A protein has these predicted regions:
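Charged interaction scaffolds used for protein-protein
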Residues: 1-236
Length: 236
């Protein structure tokens, strides 16, 4: 659930809704928030200006945890980053943010930090979006060979992106694989559907990511190459 806090700035109070769970935020929101955080850590390593100014660069390699571990920010840099995060979350301008009490900024940042906790999958197999129910492609996986799946979904590319933390690629993958019961595959509809799915909340994105990983591991174990390697290991 989201919570509402009251901010005071120049004797003016404003209620602001703060997301505290993955289901409270969309892929687009998380991408923009991630970009702000990465920008500050990247600037600490003096990366080139062009890369720092990219938008919606969602946790691209190097991973966020690597940036944080290898490039700790000093107190001044942390304050600047927190101010930018606060401004984005609350919708206040930087000028308005500078007038907000530090304790309130700290309160908001501490709430957002809950989103860094590891997501625990619930085993979702479908989701509702804009009044429609979409299903994860369980039947597709049951009927497909690993080779067919690789070819039809460009899985190798998506797995590489997912390993680098780039969950912004998943709306397109979901647009291809997740369908309503009465929906047929339509390649021409994928771009619009992908853009629409950028409005999905991150809990659904996480669930699909886990689903995709589990199904992929299962198909890998059924592939001829994997079985041959297993036999070779047993013969050693």
């Amino acid at each position: 659930m989201s919570i509402t806090i009251s901010l005071k700035s120049q004797n003016v109070e404003r209620d602001v809704v703060i997301p505290v769970e993955w289901k409270d935020i969309t892929v687009k929101y998380w991408g923009e928030l991630s970009t702000i955080i990465k920008k500050h850590y990247s600037s600490a390593t003096q990366e080139d200006e062009k890369k720092n100014n990219q938008t919606h660069e969602l946790l691209e390699s190097p991973l966020m945890e690597d940036l944080i571990k290898d490039n700790p920010l000093n107190d001044s840099q942390i304050l600047k980053m927190n101010a930018d995060i606060f401004s984005y979350i609350t919708g206040l301008t930087k000028e308005e943010t500078s007038l907000v009490d530090v304790s309130q900024i700290t309160q908001v940042i501490s709430l957002i930090n809950k989103l860094t906790e590891e997501y625990k999958p619930k085993g979702m197999s479908s989701f509702e979006f804009e009044g429609q129910k979409y299903y994860f492609p369980s039947e597709f996986f049951r009927k497909s060979t690993y080779g067919d799946f690789i070819e039809s979904t460009q899985l190798d590319m998506y797995i590489k992106d997912m390993e680098n933390g780039r969950f912004d690629v998943l709306p397109e993958q979901m647009a291809i694989l997740c369908r309503r019961l009465d929906e047929e595959y339509d390649e021409e509809a994928i771009p619009d559907k992908s853009e629409k799915f950028r409005g999905l909340t991150m809990d659904v994105i996480w669930e699909f990511s886990f689903f995709l990983t589990q199904q992929t591991e299962r198909l890998v174990k059924l592939s001829p190459t994997y079985l041959v390697k297993q036999l070779q290991v047993q013969e050693l």
